[in-house]
C-alpha cells in the first residue's frame, strides 16, 4: 500500500517534482518543474536507512554488465531542451542516461542501473546544468582558469600567450610557435581548452600555417587591422579547413563601414564578438549586424546588464586594454566613441528577444572571467523586472526565459564553435561536464563541478575538521584537478587538419584532442532559442537603436541581484 506525503515534505526529501516552483538565487526568476522522470515510491536516495543499499536500490549488476560509474540522484535539470527532474547516470566520463536510476531486479522502468561499482552524488534539492562555455578568452594569466572553473565554466576558447601587449588587447595566439606552447600548457589545467590563431593577414598561407599547427579557430581583431581584404582571406581559409572565424570589427571605420564589413563577409558564417560595440566594432552601428542570418552574435559581460555603473567604469578599462594614452586626445576620442548608453540599453532587450545569442567574458580585457553565468542571469532578471514575462511564459514561471538565457552560455557557443557533439548540454553521449547548484546560489557559486565524469571542484570546509562542512567553506580543487586524472577528465579542441597531421603526438600531448567540426554550414537558425533576425537601425546623431521601427531602450538598474549579498569583497 502506498504512503502519501505532502508536497513540502516530498520536496524536502527528494527535491521538487512536477508543478513545483523554484526561485533562482535572489532574482525575480522562477522555474517550474515540467516533468519528473523518477517514479513516485521508487525514488533512489543514498544514506543511512535510505534506498541505495545492496539488494534494495543497489543491484548485483557488475560494471561490465551495465552498472554506471556515478549516478546523480533526483536532480532538477535546467537546459535548453527542458526543466525536468531526473537521475543522471555517468559512465566512462560520459553521460550514460537521463531517467530513472535503481535496481531493475526489484524496481520498474529503470534506465540507470546502480551496482556495487556506482558512486552517488546527491542531487536532491539541487539544480544541474551543463558546464558553461566561454568563447571570448584572452589567455593573459593561467589563474583565470581556476576562477572560471569555480564559477561553473568547463570549456574556454580564445587566444593569447600570457600578459603580452598583443594578448592584453586581442584574443589571438599568433603563429605555430605560440600555438604549440599554449597547447602544451593546456595539459596542466582541468579545463577544456582551445586556441584561436591570428586571422589578420591577406596572405592565406599565414592563416593556413596556424590552423595546421592546431588552432581551433581564427580571430580577426581591429588592433591588427580588420579590413575587408583580411576578412575575406580569413573566411576563405576557414571555409577550407572547417574552423570558426571570430571578428572584432573596425571601430574607427577606417577601412569601411559596417555595410562594407557585411559585404566582405559575403553571407559566410562568422561569430561577431561584443556585437553591441562597447568592446569594439564599427561606431556607432555595429549592433545592426545581429540581423544578418549568417552572423552568430555574442556579447561580452562588462555591459551585462546595463546598470548605473556600466558607463563610468568602461573608459578606464578600454584605455588600458587597448594600449591607449590618456594624454593623446585622439586616443580618448577613440575610447569614448565605443561607449554609448543607447546601444548598451538596446543590448539588454536584444538578448531578451533572442536576437543576441551568446554571452562570453572578454577575460581581463574589459570582461570578468568568473562572472559570465552570473551576469547572464542578472540580465534575465533585469528584463523580467522591466519587461515582464515573455509571451512564452506565464505568471507562474519564467521557464522559457531561463532556457533562453542558459542557452547563451552552454549550447549556443558550443554550436558556434563546432563542439556541440561533445559539450554544451546535458544529453546522452556527451562528455559529463556538469555543474550542481543550490538554488539559492544558482549562477553565483556552484556547489560541485563534475569534469569528464569526475569531481573537479567543490565547495569544501576545513580539511582538518571532523566532517566536510565546518568553515571556512569555499570552492577548492578536487582530485580530478590533479595528476593523470586531470589528463583523462579534460580535453583540447583543435582543427581537424592538425589532428590528421599528428600535431598532438608531435607536441607530446596527453590530453585527448578533439576536432572541431561543422562550423561553416551553420547560421543563426541553428542556435537554440536565440534566433530572431531584427531589422536594426541606429540614429547616427543620437545613437538610438530601432528594431523593426520600434525604439529599444531601458533604464539602468541601481541594484542587481547575485551581487553583494553573496560576496564579502
Swiss-Prot record:
Active site: residue positions: 322 (proton donor)
GO cellular component: cytoplasm
UniProt superkingdom: Bacteria
Subcellular location, record wording: Cytoplasm
Stored InterPro entries: Amidohydro-rel, Metal-dep_hydrolase_composite, Metal_Hydrolase, Urease_alpha_N_dom, Urease_alpha_subunit, Urease_AS, Urease_asu, Urease_asu_c
Enzyme Commission number(s) from the entry: 3.5.1.5
Keyword Hydrolase on entry: yes
Pathway the protein contributes to: Nitrogen metabolism; urea degradation; CO(2) and NH(3) from urea (urease route): step 1/1
Binding site for Ni(2+) 2: 219, 248, 274
N6-carboxylysine modified-residue sites: 219
PTMs per UniProt: Carboxylation allows a single lysine to coordinate two nickel ions.
Entry keyword Oxidoreductase: no
Matches recorded under CDD domains: Urease_alpha
Molecular function GO terms recorded: nickel cation binding; urease activity
Gene Ontology process terms (BP): urea catabolic process
UniProt binding sites for substrate: 221
Required cofactor(s): Ni cation
Pfam families: Amidohydro_1 (PF01979), Urease_alpha (PF00449)
Positions of Ni(2+) 1 binding: 136, 138, 219, 362
Subunit structure: Heterotrimer of UreA (gamma), UreB (beta) and UreC (alpha) subunits. Three heterotrimers associate to form the active enzyme.
Family named by the database record: Belongs to the metallo-dependent hydrolases superfamily. Urease alpha subunit family.
PANTHER family named among the record's database cross-references: UREASE (PTHR43440:SF1)
Name the record gives this protein: Urease subunit alpha
Organism, as annotated: Prochlorococcus marinus (strain AS9601)
Chain's gene name: ureC
Amino acid at each position: 500500500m502506498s504512503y502519501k506525503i505532502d508536497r513540502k515534505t516530498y520536496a524536502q526529501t527528494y527535491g521538487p517534482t512536477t508543478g513545483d516552483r523554484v526561485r533562482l538565487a535572489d532574482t525575480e526568476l522562477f522555474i517550474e518543474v515540467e516533468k519528473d522522470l523518477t517514479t513516485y515510491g521508487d525514488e533512489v536516495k543514498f544514506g543511512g536507512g535510505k534506498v541505495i543499499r545492496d539488494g534494495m536500490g543497489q543491484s548485483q549488476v557488475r560494471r561490465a554488465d551495465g552498472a554506471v560509474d556515478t549516478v546523480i540522484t533526483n536532480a532538477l535539470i535546467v537546459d535548453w531542451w527542458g526543466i525536468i527532474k531526473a537521475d543522471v547516470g555517468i559512465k566512462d566520463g560520459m553521460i550514460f542516461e537521463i531517467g530513472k536510476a535503481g535496481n531493475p531486479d526489484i524496481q520498474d522502468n529503470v534506465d540507470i542501473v546502480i551496482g556495487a561499482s556506482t558512486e552517488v552524488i546527491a542531487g536532491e534539492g539541487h539544480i544541474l546544468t551543463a558546464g558553461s562555455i566561454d568563447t571570448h578568452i584572452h589567455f593573459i594569466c593561467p589563474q583565470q582558469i581556476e576562477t572560471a572553473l569555480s564559477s561553473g565554466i568547463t570549456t574556454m576558447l580564445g587566444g593569447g600567450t600570457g600578459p603580452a601587449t598583443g594578448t592584453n588587447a586581442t584574443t589571438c595566439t599568433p603563429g605555430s610557435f605560440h600555438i604549440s606552447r599554449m597547447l602544451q600548457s593546456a595539459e596542466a589545467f582541468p579545463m577544456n581548452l582551445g586556441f584561436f590563431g591570428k586571422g589578420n593577414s591577406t596572405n592565406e598561407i599565414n592563416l593556413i600555417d596556424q590552423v595546421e599547427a592546431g588552432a581551433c579557430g581564427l580571430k580577426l581583431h581591429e588592433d591588427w587591422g580588420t579590413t575587408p581584404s583580411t576578412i575575406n582571406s580569413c573566411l576563405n581559409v576557414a571555409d577550407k579547413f572547417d574552423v570558426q572565424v571570430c571578428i572584432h570589427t573596425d571601430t574607427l571605420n577606417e577601412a569601411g563601414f559596417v555595410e562594407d564589413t557585411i559585404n566582405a563577409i559575403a553571407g559566410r558564417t562568422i561569430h561577431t564578438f561584443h556585437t553591441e560595440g562597447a568592446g569594439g566594432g564599427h561606431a556607432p552601428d555595429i549592433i545592426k549586424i545581429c540581423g544578418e542570418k549568417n552572423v552568430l552574435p555574442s556579447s561580452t559581460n562588462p555591459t551585462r546588464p546595463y546598470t548605473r555603473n556600466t558607463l563610468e567604469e568602461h573608459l578606464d578599462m578600454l584605455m588600458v586594454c587597448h594600449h591607449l594614452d590618456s594624454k593623446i586626445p585622439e586616443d580618448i576620442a577613440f575610447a569614448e566613441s565605443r561607449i554609448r548608453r543607447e546601444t548598451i540599453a538596446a543590448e539588454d532587450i536584444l538578448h531578451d528577444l533572442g536576437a543576441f545569442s551568446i554571452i562570453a567574458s572578454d577575460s581581463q580585457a574589459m570582461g570578468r572571467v568568473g562572472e559570465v553565468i552570473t551576469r547572464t542571469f542578472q540580465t534575465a532578471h533585469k528584463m523580467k523586472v522591466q519587461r515582464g514575462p515573455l509571451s512564452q511564459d506565464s505568471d507562474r514561471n519564467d521557464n522559457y526565459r531561463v532556457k533562453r538565457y542558459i542557452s547563451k552560455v552552454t549550447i549556443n557557443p558550443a554550436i558556434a564553435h563546432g563542439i556541440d557533439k561533445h559539450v554544451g548540454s546535458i544529453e546522452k553521449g556527451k562528455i559529463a561536464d556538469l555543474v550542481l547548484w543550490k538554488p539559492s546560489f544558482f549562477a553565483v557559486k556552484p556547489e560541485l563541478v563534475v569534469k569528464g565524469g569526475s569531481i573537479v571542484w567543490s565547495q569544501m570546509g576545513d580539511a582538518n575538521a571532523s566532517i566536510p562542512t565546518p568553515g571556512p567553506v569555499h570552492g577548492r580543487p578536487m582530485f580530478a584537478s590533479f595528476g593523470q586524472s586531470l589528463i583523462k577528465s579534460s580535453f583540447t579542441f583543435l582543427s581537424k587538419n592538425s589532428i590528421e597531421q599528428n600535431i598532438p603526438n608531435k607536441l607530446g600531448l596527453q590530453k585527448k584532442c578533439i576536432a572541431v567540426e561543422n562550423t561553416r554550414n551553420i547560421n543563426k537558425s541553428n542556435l537554440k532559442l536565440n534566433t530572431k533576425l531584427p531589422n536594426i537601425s541606429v540614429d547616427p546623431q543620437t545613437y538610438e537603436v530601432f528594431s523593426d521601427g520600434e525604439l529599444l531602450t531601458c533604464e539602468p538598474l541601481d541594484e542587481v541581484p547575485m551581487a553583494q549579498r553573496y560576496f564579502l569583497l
